C-alpha cells in the first residue's frame, strides 16, 4: 500500500512539475500564439522529411536488441521496445524503470532470464554511456565558436564524468573475474543501501552472480559489441536528425543555430530524459533544450516551436505504436526457465 501511495505521489509531483513548465515558464519565453504561427509555416516538403525521420527513429529502436538477441524477430523487437518506452513516457522512473520493463517484455517473448538480463544490462550500459558522453562532444564542437557558457560546460563535464565512471566499471567487469566480483559486490551494497532508503527488499545480487554471468556471456559480447555500438549510435542519432530537421522546418537557419549548437542542446535533453524527474521527461526536457538554444541567442518563438515539434514527433509515434504492441503483449505469458 505504501509503495502504491509513493508511486502515485511521484506521478502527481511529476505531472505538477510538467504543468508548471508549460503553464508558467514556457509562455514567458514565447507566447503560444507566436509558437503556433511558426508551426503553421512548416511547408509540406519539411513535413514529409520530418515524417520520414520520425519513422526511422521508431524503426531503429529494434537494432540494438537484434544485435544482442538475433533470435528476436524484427517485429517482436520493435514491439517490445516501443511498448516499454511508451510506459516510461507515462510513468516516472527514467532509465532504471525502462530497463525493468524491458526485462519483463523479453520474458514474455520467450527469452530466458539469463539472456534477457544480459541484453537489458548491456543495451542499458551502451545507451547510457553514449547519452552521457554526447554533451561533451557537443561542448567541444561549440567551444571553438566561443559561445560555450560556464553552466553548459559544467553540465557537459559532469555528464561525461558519469559516463566515464560507467564505462570504467563495465571495462572492469570484462577485464577479469576478480574485477567483476568487486564491481558486483559494490553494486549489491549500493543497491541494498538504496533499497533500504525506500524501504524495499535488497536486490538478490552478488559479485559471484556477476562472475557467472560474465563467464557465460563474455564470448557472445566479444562477437557482438561492434554491431551493438553501431546500432545504438544509429538509433540515437536518428532522434538528433528529427531535432535538426525540426529546427530548419520552423525557419531557424544554420547561421542562427549551427549543427554544433543544436547537437549540444539535443544532447542535454537526452541526459535530462534519462533522469526520473517527470514521466518521459516531459516539461524538464523541453525546458533544458529551449534554455540551451535561447542561451545561444536563437529567436525564442522559433526555438520553442522547434523543440515542441521535435518532442511531439518523438513521443506521439512511440505512444501509438507502443500501446498497440501492449495489447498484443497482454496475451503472452512469461517463459518459465
Language-model-derived ranges and their functions:
Residues 33-38, 106, 209-221:
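A short amphipathic helical element positioned immediately N-terminal to and/or at the very start
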Residues 43-45, 72-79, 112-113, 150-151, ...:
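Membrane-helix interface segments
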Residues 1-37, 84-199, 278, 282-337:
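Transmembrane helix-loop-helix hairpins in multi-pass inner-membrane proteins
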Residues 58-86, 247-265:
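Membrane-embedded helical hairpins/re-entrant loop segments and their flanking transmembrane helices
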Residues 8-9, 41-51, 217-230:
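Membrane-interface helix starts
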